[in-house]
């Protein structure tokens, strides 16, 4: 037996060993375990390399480091709210908010997501309007600007925003940017050079520590937050790039959902940014200071919670919030997501609602952002139709919104898609909203989108080719690790 054969045997033994590690040592969902076993078994050696890059869980040390930075300045307020709601003494602003105290309590206990009731919220469904408003707020900034985006492209929109940030940094403002190392992988470091020379600070999230190899590649910071002077915050689905203004020939018009918030909910966005910055940066750590949490004299009436989730937690807070909302539905469930790949618990919750007579409507894109993932989406949509749920295909460009509206009373908007990746692997952030007027605006936007969609009927779905059916089956089988 030659040297090459010996090496091959060793690699195959290692492959079997890591397959065993996947099954017996790492705590993970059963469906994900079986998906990785398939990869390791049927793609030996290369499957092992893929597993090293995409399959390993964050170590206990990394998780501990994250948790050591959590809840800056809000621990006492969280504990007080939990106790007041438990004792039924919390001063809810209106009956609709009080009606959903169980959901509020769940998110408080799971994530420390404080309920704030004095927020003014503006809804954006168009990228031009969102970025015009964001840049106008940045232009008016007096003290600091904090941005975190999964994608920050160096194209026309990226340069337009960067010129403003460079100028504000040169004026002496505290300006910090976090971008995801994977999401913004095509953006060169030189793009930020003038910004940094002017005093701005920028950090990639989970960058590669080795050339061409990043063992944390699978854990992405998918959050999109902007905080200006601790006074105004933005949260939603728009990244920074020309395609989000509808400039992509592939996608055309880009339909997304974003919120501008003025009120105490901005405190939670600020806290989230501080935690992410202190994890991404080994220097220039941010301490809790009053400048980052100014006194509000709110005139708004929107009650909301800012909820974060990620692989640093075992609870999947946003998904649990979705399930609680769906279980509470009596009349309608309106759901939008570019990727609809629910795990068993979420899928069962939606099915039960549909079978109980709730009007369930799910909206997905008419074209793939990621072709392989899209086939899993259509497969799950087809299964859901069997329960009486209605599936709508958005046909006016690309739908990227991550929105859930229930009974016209509660809603969630943010960065989390309805898929395994958002619930288990990505760092996400969503707003959970309890004010009927704001929820009605989100419901109206959904119904307007239906006018630009066509319904996927069982008859239409049955006409897909054998090749499409095969791709759906394979994509669904591997969906827990996509």
Curated annotation (Swiss-Prot):
E.C. code: 2.7.8.-
Active site: 222, 224, 229, 400, 402, 407
PROSITE patterns from the UniProt entry: PLD
Keyword vocabulary terms for this entry: Cell membrane, Lipid biosynthesis, Lipid metabolism, Membrane, Phospholipid biosynthesis, Phospholipid metabolism, Repeat, Transferase, Transmembrane, Transmembrane helix
Molecular function as annotated in GO: cardiolipin synthase activity
Main location: membrane
TM annotation in the entry: 4-24, 34-54
Membrane topology listed for this record: Multi-pass membrane protein
Keyword Metal-binding: no
Family annotation (Pfam families): PLDc_2, PLDc_N
Record's GO cellular component terms: plasma membrane
Places the protein is found: Cell membrane
Record CDD domains: PLDc_CLS_1 (cd09110), PLDc_CLS_2 (cd09112)
Catalyzed reaction equations: 2 a 1,2-diacyl-sn-glycero-3-phospho-(1'-sn-glycerol) = a cardiolipin + glycerol
Domain PLD phosphodiesterase, first and last residues per copy: 217-244, 395-422
Biological process according to GO: cardiolipin biosynthetic process
NCBIfam families for this protein: bac_cardiolipin
PANTHER family with a match to the protein in the record: CARDIOLIPIN SYNTHASE (PTHR21248), PHOSPHOLIPASE D (PTHR21248:SF22)
HAMAP family documented for this protein: Cardiolipin_synth_Cls
Family statement drawn from the similarity comment of this UniProt entry: Belongs to the phospholipase D family. Cardiolipin synthase subfamily.
Function: Catalyzes the reversible phosphatidyl group transfer from one phosphatidylglycerol molecule to another to form cardiolipin (CL) (diphosphatidylglycerol) and glycerol.
Protein name in the entry: Cardiolipin synthase
Gene that specifies this protein: cls
């Amino acid at each position: 037996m030659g040297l090459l054969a010996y090496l091959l045997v060793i690699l195959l033994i290692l492959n079997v060993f890591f397959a065993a590690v996947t099954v017996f040592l790492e705590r993970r969902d059963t469906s994900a375990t079986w998906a990785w076993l398939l990869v390791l078994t049927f793609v030996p050696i290369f499957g092992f390399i893929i597993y090293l890059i995409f399959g390993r869980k964050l170590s206990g040390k990394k998780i501990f480091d994250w948790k050591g930075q959590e809840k800056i300045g809000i621990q006492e307020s969280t504990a007080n709210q939990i106790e007041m709601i438990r004792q039924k003494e919390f001063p809810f602003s209106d009956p609709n908010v009080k009606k959903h105290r169980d959901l509020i309590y769940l998110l408080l206990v799971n994530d420390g997501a404080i309920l704030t009731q004095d927020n003014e919220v503006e809804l954006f469904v168009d990228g031009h309007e969102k970025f015009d408003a964001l840049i106008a707020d940045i232009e008016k900034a007096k003290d600091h600007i904090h941005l975190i985006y999964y994608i920050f492209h160096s194209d026309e929109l990226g340069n337009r925003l960067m010129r403003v940030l460079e100028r504000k940094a040169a004026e002496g403002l505290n300006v910090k940017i976090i971008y995801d190392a994977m999401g913004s992988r095509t953006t060169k470091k030189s793009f930020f050079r003038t910004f940094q020379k002017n005093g701005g600070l920028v950090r990639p999230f989970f960058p590669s520590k080795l050339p061409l190899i990043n063992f944390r590649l699978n854990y992405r910071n998918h959050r999109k937050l902007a905080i200006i002077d601790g006074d105004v915050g933005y949260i939603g689905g728009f990244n920074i790039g020309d395609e989000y203004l509808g400039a992509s020939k592939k996608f055309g018009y880009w339909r997304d959902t974003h919120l501008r918030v003025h009120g105490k909910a901005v405190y939670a966005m600020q806290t989230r940014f501080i935690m992410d910055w202190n994890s991404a940066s080994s220097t220039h750590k941010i301490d809790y200071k009053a400048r980052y949490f100014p006194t509000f004299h709110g005139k708004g009436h929107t009650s909301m919670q800012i909820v974060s989730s990620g692989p640093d937690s075992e609870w999947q807070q946003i998904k649990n919030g979705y399930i609680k909302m769906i279980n509470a539905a009596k009349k309608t469930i309106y759901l939008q997501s570019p990727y609809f790949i629910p795990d068993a618990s979420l899928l069962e919750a939606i099915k039960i609602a549909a079978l109980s007579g709730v009007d369930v409507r799910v909206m997905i894109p008419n074209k793939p952002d990621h072709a392989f993932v899209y086939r899993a989406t259509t497969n799950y949509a087809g299964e859901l139709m069997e329960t009486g749920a209605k599936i709508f295909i958005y046909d006016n460009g690309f739908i990227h919104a991550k929105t859930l509206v229930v009974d016209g009373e509660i809603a969630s908007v943010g960065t989390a898609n309805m898929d395994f990746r958002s619930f288990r692997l990505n760092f996400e952030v969503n707003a959970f909203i309890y004010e009927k007027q704001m929820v009605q605006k989100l419901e109206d936007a959904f119904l307007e989108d239906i006018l630009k969609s066509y319904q996927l009927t069982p008859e239409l779905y049955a006409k897909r080719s054998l090749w499409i059916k095969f791709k759906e089956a394979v994509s669904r089988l591997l969906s827990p690790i996509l």
